[in-house]
Amino acid sequence: MWGLCKNHFPSNKIQVQERNKALKPKKSGSEHKTKQLFPVFNCKKKEKGVMIRFAILRNANTSLLSARSICLFTQAPTYCHVRLNTLNKSITTKRNSLTESKRHVHDGKHFFTTPHQQQQTKLGEIEEGHSPNIKGEDLRSIGQAITHQRNKRRKQIWSAIFGGIFGVILGYSLIYRVIYLKEQSFLPLFPSSKIRKLSSRDLKKVDVNQVQKLSKLRVLEILSGHDMIKEQYGVPLLDKDGNSPTLNEFSMWCEDQDPCVTGIVMEPDDKRDSSHTWYRIPFVCKWRITHRPISIRGTIDDLLNRIGLETSDLFEIISPERVYGSFKYEYPLQGDSHALHLWFHGEIELDDDSLIVYNGKYHVDVKLQEIDLFRREKNGQLVQYVLYKNEAGDK
């Protein structure tokens, strides 16, 4: 553009002075039009920008192409205009982004729509003249849909959490412990009672007939020395037929020292004979349901052993009641690392109205805890007489 216009502008000071003299005394309508089309080169700062004026000599021959180029040059934006337009665009963009971010904020009341859209919907319904009943039904249906969606999502989250926990536990117990390490694994299910019946495996290790005979002898020995029995029943103690009293009922059970849980024991499927009843998954593992105690002290010992310490390094508990007959020295089942109480209960009938009831514990020898006499008196009342009670024993 400068190449087209440079020949029509004065190149020295003399030409500029001659041009000014020629333009100063004469003012006509054509000159006024020339000033409007090509203003004098004079930069005046205004509030909104810079105005550039150009003037062409009166006698100069200006082609149409050159005049058009000069007009285009006068209409070109300046640096101030470009800078101002850039700032305005950036401010407008920031305002629009803030407005859009505020519109897209979600809360508990607007699940499927934004607050702005809901306001527009309400205004449109009011302008159209919808009845409040239809509006309430719509809101109620939307609320039910939101509640259903939240409940469904909550169920999915909890299902994923429990499924992940179950998968990790089962993978560690079965895949890692049993299949990879070829070890026994115990998977606890729910708490169980500390008192339970003796299993068939336990009964093989305990001579129940011997315990029954020993308990009867100990009971008769104690009753023979009791004053009430001597006075009212005589010594030796006999039944109504004049024979030695017999046991009407005798039972045994065991009690664990620690809290117990019921769970599943899993082992590698080695097809060995066992006294337990196993359920097999071919070529994978065998499993059965059993009860196991939770030894708190044993758990602490295991944790200390892993870091190279022992319980005796920190403290030592000396309990004076841990003597013969206590939990520490009770009958241990083979293969188990915990002690058990072996309890027994028996009944001896003296006559139709008198019954001897006793209970105690067994460990190598019988240790009686209590002997009671239940007798129906002449007035028809059933009375319990405590003939013997071991105060020092743990019941």
From Swiss-Prot:
Keywords carried by this UniProt record: Membrane, Mitochondrion, Transit peptide, Transmembrane, Transmembrane helix
Compartments where found: Mitochondrion membrane
Membrane topology annotation: Single-pass membrane protein
GO CC, any one term: mitochondrial membrane
TM regions (residue ranges): 156-176
Source superkingdom: Eukaryota
Signal peptide start and end residues: none
Keyword Metal-binding: no
Recorded family membership: Belongs to the AIM39 family.
Protein name: Altered inheritance of mitochondria protein 39, mitochondrial
Species annotation: Saccharomyces cerevisiae (strain JAY291) (Baker's yeast)
Gene that encodes it: AIM39
